[in-house]
Amino acid sequence: NYDKNFLRF
């Protein structure tokens, strides 16, 4: 799973 911070983009 990707970082939550990355998904914010």
Curated annotation (Swiss-Prot):
Modified residues (Phenylalanine amide): F9
Keywords, in A-Z order: Amidation, Neuropeptide, Secreted
Secreted among keywords: yes
One GO biological process term: neuropeptide signaling pathway
Main localisation: secreted
Record bears the keyword Nucleotide-binding: no
GO cellular component: extracellular region
Subcellular location: Secreted
UniProt record similarity statement: Belongs to the FARP (FMRFamide related peptide) family.
Name of the protein in question: FMRFamide-like neuropeptide FLP3
